[in-house]
Regions:
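Nuclease catalytic cores that cleave nucleic-acid phosphodiester bonds
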Residues: 2-99
Length: 99
């Protein structure tokens, strides 16, 4: 079973490349995930729902299914919210540099 990595898109993008397009971020994450042998989901803000709330809900869902879950963010509040359900938290800047 490979890990599922949930990426806080705006947090990661702002960490290193504030002008990077959404598409380029997704492409970089997809290439990284393929190299690392993990599954990745880049999470953006949605209609009426923050990316943070979407990440928290998805993390809880995946954890309940017994999946290995990582979250990439430097957002302190988000890190605290997902900590009980994740196997690894990667800082946004650190994650961006891995891409």
């Amino acid at each position: 079973m490979s890990a599922i990595v949930l990426v806080d898109a705006e947090n990661v993008r702002r960490s290193v490349w504030p002008n990077l397009s959404r598409e380029e971020l997704v492409e970089r994450v997809e290439r990284w995930a393929e190299r690392e042998g993990v599954h990745a989901q880049v999470v953006f803000e949605g209609r009426g729902e923050t990316a943070d709330d979407r990440i928290v809900a998805k993390t809880a869902e995946l954890h309940a299914q017994g999946e290995e879950v990582w979250v990439a963010t430097s957002d302190r509040e988000l890190r605290e919210r997902v900590e009980p359900c994740v196997d690894r938290i990667i800082g946004g800047g650190s994650f961006a540099r891995m891409l």
